[in-house]
Amino acid sequence: MVWYQKLILIFKDKQLRNKILFVLAIFVVFRLAANIPIPGIDTENLQKFFSQSQIFGLLNLFTGGALSRLSIVMLGLGPYITATIILQLLTMIFPAFKKMYEEEGEEGRRKFNQYARMATVPLGALQGYAMLALFQHQGIIGSISPLLLLTSILTITCGAVFLMWLGELISEKGIGNGVSLLIFAGIVARTPMEIRNVVLTWDPANIPSYILFFSVALLIITGVVMVNEARRNIPVSYAKRVRGMKMYGGFSTYLPININPAGVIPIIFALSILLFPGMIANFLSGTGNQFLASFAQGVNSFLQNAWIYGVSYFALVFLFTYFYTAVTFGPKTVANNLQKMGGFIPGIRPGTPTAGFLHRILYKILFIGATFLGTIAIMPSIIQGTTGVGAFEFLIGGTALLIMVSVVLDMWRQVKAQMEMREYEKF
């Protein structure tokens, strides 16, 4: 079946069509909110600031341009992502959190998500205040009264919570991962503007840079498709069981383990962590303290080095691939579930030996996936550092492309799974 026939089938299925239309409707709401600014903005100073700040240019990518407009959702999903990272780190430090997340099933996940929601509020308020203080120092926002400052912080915090809610609505009632899809929507929304900027600033002397960029873009697309689609199939057999006059089991299947089971989440987490020191440095530069201002300038210079940025980016993507997979995929849980259902891996004893086998296989596969994903993520940075062509937008383009391709592949995989499930329901 060719791709356009599959698209026709998708829109013929009422339930699947409604899910996709629901996601598109959420995208529209998100883009409307991204264009509602907070009051008292100096537009000229705002544009000047973002043209000079590389770190905030990358942060603006994640918010879909909402930050460069100082909209009510200018923090994007940053506070929620930060809260999730903190809580997932706590699962590796405190056994109670780990037990809640891994062993209490759906109820434990619900509690975990509730804690993440609660942590989003103070983090959103803190980041909102830091942003307002920074923009006020830069002359983007004029002098404001304490009441207006409090109102603005509450508005920005509510915007962060609102986006978190939209992401959860997509995950629950739509299709795909809500956080990834909202970031994807923000990147796509900025694409026409980026194309317009390229056309307006066209210079024949930059043709080699454009050729190099599109060549790397093609390599990134190919690499991401390979990493997302590659998997290791582990054979699983089910023992025969007799109940009454009927026999159950006695068949073989396989347990698929993706080379990169974490998907695009390591990229999002890595960039969230990587951007944090730059945000703090920009905030400290406006405190008026000479020592803090010098320290902030040093941090900014450090982060703007392409090689340092690339090494840090690679290391964080690599580590978060392992970290997120360890949190979401438990070999012990899978082994216990197989044993309860009468399944076993040929040549491996059920229970603890199976968990150990899955653990070894998973971490060998993850080394390949994490290395490949990290390499693709920093490929534009490597080219900029070795050839000197391109600018920071080159890095942004590579990161955006990586996120977009990964999200589209994950979305398409879930759509195909929904279609196959509908086919089975007919019998």
Predicted regions and their residues:
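N-terminal cationic and glycine-rich segments that engage phosphates or anionic surfaces
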Residues: 1-427
